[in-house]
Design a protein with these regions (language model features):
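Non-catalytic, glycine-rich low-complexity segments
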Residues: 1-38, 141-142
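Aromatic-rich carbohydrate-binding modules that target alpha-glucans
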Residues: 20-92, 102-124
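N-terminal carbohydrate-binding accessory modules
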Residues: 23-25, 121-154, 167, 198-205
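Active-site-proximal helices and loops of the catalytic beta/alpha 8
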Residues: 40, 212-213, 248, 317, ...
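Asparagine-centered strand-capping/turn motif at beta-strand->loop junctions
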Residues: 574-578
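C-terminal beta-strand-rich structural cap/linker in extracellular carbohydrate-active enzymes
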Residues: 606-626
Length: 626
């Protein structure tokens, strides 16, 4: 429904039709249970379209919009009012606009468009484009892979492109130029940090954001689409980027922030907050569940669900994305309530995906930073959740060093059994680093101590789920970041020169090799793990040689599964987190031989056991196919 609203351009007629929808809780009570009326007297539109030759706004003469009842064609129900106006034909170009809203008993407000497709250059204006190139997103080459087959690269568009951007190039164009390097690394999916428009200051030097303070859910940020050499190509750059990803077999996952909105001052905050005379009456905003952040969206009300659902469907259908990461879903989820919030939203999205023949679409949660997120993933029908204990425990073992050196502890066994408790068809997103926390290499002590990270890299790519790395991790970026405060969300441009020198070259090769091994062996993507259910008071290997030897900083585990051709693959993984070479012995079920995949050395058992020496801060992946 909401995809029909906004500033929609008829490229043949060169006109734009503005449509602003306001639900009516009195005449359409199904739209919301909590909230009041907007108390709007009338709505006008102002913008650079008023004087297209000079792109001047005429605030003294706002263009009055016509109000009429809106009946949803999907169900024939009255939903509220729509305010509309169609312009005369306009010259090609990029135009900006806002709604001028007068209330019954409050000062008028200039408010941005909640359904605009473009963010503006300043003051959180909305935008539209007349003319320019037309692009249709090309589908993914081949077929969309099951989630566990993905190797994900988390990409922050600004930091990724800042130091390699050409003068007359939009940041989204720069990403396209770097895609082949990511393919060489071995990933097959990119999770883009939010590209939707956020609230920003007028000072161009202060409009940096990670994107987790959204205001317009249908809109791509002007910062990412701006090419100084042309004004008519904007959204086309995002479409081309997704097409170029798809041409290379790269899945595109959108990071969606649907828990909250930024209610900055009226002229630039979340429109559906400020479209109400008393913003407290907005049915779109309210504390639905725990974890209030900015202004929480109120999923107790149908209008909120429909707005966010339709925004998701817009990105799915029009931009052909392959998955959505749902940021901070704590505020969208009430345990036991399947009729509202996250369960209802995902149910309606799954229904749409089924109707449109859209298989293997990823629905990924960021929920609790503990194992309780697994049960929520199962309960709401998501594909995956970010399994943050994988990061937090790895960070702790690497960096805390109570005795002066990295020390693993028995809870690592539950961490490595990352696929545990997920329903069939669901799996974790595993990582040792992401945008939200300090760099893993920094925790190691900096790039000089890169070798300390090696057993964790081996673990990540031999665990169940879809492994994720954060941009720059592949060559050992080690910039610091506080966990909170003003120095947290600031630019941290990637230094691509680090990829051309040591230790960046070696670190890159470690990640590339482990990704290659994972792609070549489907059984590593299964959930099978031994020893499962490890007693976390036990710091000794079991009688078969598996588990953790805390005193020697050694871990041994077994993974297995089908190779995709009906053959059994077995993997025996040994991780040495210590500063000395360690001798390890563990049982295997046959006479071998076994290939150690990191070195390609062939070893054979003796008396039913493999006896191996593993170098310090290193590991072994012993493989045999039946």
């Amino acid at each position: 429904m909401y995809e029909q609203f906004g500033g929609l351009v008829d490229q043949n007629a060169k006109t734009v039709t503005f449509q602003l929808f306001i639900p009516d809780g009195e005449r359409a009570p199904s739209q919301y249970e909590g909230g009041g009326l907007p108390r709007i007297k009338d709505v006008s539109v102002v913008g650079s379209f008023q004087d297209p030759a000079h792109r001047r706004w005429d605030l003294a003469h706002p263009v009055l919009m016509t109000a009429s009842d809106y009946v949803d064609p999907a169900d024939g129900e009255l939903k509220g009012l729509v305010y509309a106006h169609t312009t005369a034909p306009l010259p090609d170009g990029f135009y900006e606009y806002k709604y001028f809203v007068r209330f019954e008993n409050a000062s008028p407000r200039l408010i941005t468009d909640p359904c605009a497709r473009y963010g503006g250059t300043e003051q959180q204006n909305s935008g539209f484009v007349v003319g320019g190139h037309v692009e249709t997103v090309r589908p993914l080459a081949g077929h969309r892979l099951p989630f566990s087959d993905l190797i994900i690269y988390e990409l922050m568009i600004d930091d990724f492109t800042s130091r390699v951007r050409h003068p007359n190039e939009a940041p989204l164009e720069t990403v396209v130029r770097k895609l082949d390097e990511l393919v060489r690394l071995g990933i097959n999916a990119i999770e883009f940090m939010p590209w939707t428009a956020w609230a920003y200051a007028d000072d161009p030097g202060r409009d940096f954001s990670w994107g987790y303070n959204p205001v317009q859910y249908f809109s791509v940020s002007h910062r990412y689409t701006h090419n100084p050499s042309t004004e008519t190509d904007k959204l086309v750059y995002l479409k081309r980027l997704i097409s170029e990803c798809h041409n290379r077999g790269l899945h595109v996952i959108m990071d969606g922030v649907f828990n909250h909105a930024d209610a900055a001052p009226p002229d630039r905050g979340f429109p559906y907050y400020w479209l109400y005379q008393d913003p407290a009456d907005s049915p779109y905003v309210g504390n639905f569940a725990e974890h209030a952040f900015f202004q929480d969206l109120d999923y107790a009300n149908q209008c909120t669900l429909e707005y966010i659902r339709d925004a998701c469907i817009y990105w799915i259908d029009t931009l052909k994305i392959d998955g959505i990461r749902f940021d901070n879903t704590l505020g969208m989820y009430r345990p036991g309530d399947r009729g509202h919030g996250l369960p209802k939203l995902l149910a309606e999205l799954r229904a749409h995906l089924s109707r449109t023949g859209n298989p293997n679409f990823s629905l990924i949660l960021e929920h609790e930073w503990n194992y309780s997120s697994v049960a929520v993933t199962n309960n709401v029908g998501a594909t995956s959740c970010w399994l943050d204990p994988y990061r937090s425990l790895s960070m702790s073992y690497l960096g805390d060093r109570p005795a002066g050196f990295p020390q693993v502890e028995p809870p690592i066994m539950r961490m490595l059994d990352s696929g545990r408790d997920f329903d069939p068809g669901r799996a974790p997103t595993t990582y040792i680093e992401n945008h939200d926390h300090q760099r893993f290499m920094r925790k190691a002590g900096g790039r000089t101590f890169w070798y300390l990270t090696q057993p964790y890299i081996i673990a990540l790519f031999t665990s169940a789920g879809a492994p994720l790395i954060y941009n720059g991790q592949e060559y050992g970026a080690d910039n610091d970041m506080p966990e909170d405060g003003l120095g947290r969300v600031v630019p941290r441009p990637l230094d691509w020169d680090w990829l051309l020198e040591e230790p960046g070259l070696t670190v890159f090769e470690r990640y590339r090799q482990m990704m290659e091994i994972r792609r070549a062996h489907p059984a590593l993507r299964s959930s099978n793990f031994y020893p499962r259910g490890w007693d976390e008071s036990n710091g000794e290997l079991n009688q078969h040689g598996f588990g953790i030897n805390r005193a020697r900083n050694v871990v041994v585990y077994h993974r297995w599964g089908d190779d995709g051709q009906g053959h059994l693959e077995r993997f025996y993984i040994v991780l040495n987190f210590s500063q000395q070479t360690q001798h390890v012995s563990f049982e295997v079920p046959n006479d071998g031989p076994y290939t150690e995949l990191l070195s390609n050395m062939v070893v054979s058992p003796s008396n039913g056991r493999l006896n191996v020496d593993i170098g310090s801060n290193w590991g072994g992946v012993y493989y045999r196919k039946s």
